[in-house]
Amino acid sequence: ALKQFSNSGDHATQQMVAGFMAHWPEELADFALRCGLLDAIHPDLCAAIIDQPNAADLFDQLRNETPLLTAVGNSGWLRLHPLIREYLRTRSSNSLSADEQQEIHRRAWQWLAEQGDAEQAARHALAAGYAQEAFALIADHLYDLCMKEGHYGTVADWLSRMPESIIFSNTALRLTAGWQAALSGNWKRAEHYVGSLVEPPCADSALYGEALAILAVGNSRAERLDVAERYCAAYPVDAPDS
């Protein structure tokens, strides 16, 4: 059934999900509608975003009565099937007021931030209309996403949302944007973000060294090997590994 559901078209999906939800109690359907604004659900998160004392019971009911949820390991988290989540989000945008949607995102942002989930917290902060707070939350996390986890698409998506002034106001974001450009061979873009970091005076040898590494990689990937070699030659011997 799930395979058939996954292969269904948009109209068929809407009909299938609508028919499925028609058999739910109204309270459960309303609960699912609000959960549709989340990427994954947890009983404590649901309790945080919904003013219902029985949120945990509704979570259990949703988990037990629908096959369209996938457990995320043994963490207590559940993930909605992408198609039903998309359907619920469309319904939410049509059924819930803008103020209620914003409040759900605001509560999700604050709860997720308290749990240390910077990326998801930032996504909800952005959806709630708090762009500056979202960018501040994600700034340091983006560097790790790029350099340690290789989630280049996620990094590129976040950077594309940020004004240049935000990126240049945060050193971690400048380095992240520089690496993102360098690893794709866009040496001009890499230079745009970190070029000034290799200009004297530069008291921080670690920062200077990493900026040189970014420029060396960007030029090397663009097959500007002579320029890359010059940046490599300038790398300070006392700079720590980045």
Where are these regions (language model features)?
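Amphipathic helix/helix-loop-helix segment enriched in hydrophobic residues with interspersed Lys/Arg
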Residues: 1-9
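C-terminal boundary/linker of central alpha/beta nucleotide-binding cores
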Residues: 14-94, 102-106
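Alpha-helical hairpin
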Residues: 23-24, 80, 147, 175, ...
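Extended alpha-helical scaffolding segments used for macromolecular assembly and cargo binding
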Residues: 98-193
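Internal alpha-solenoid helical repeat scaffolds
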Residues: 159-160, 164-242
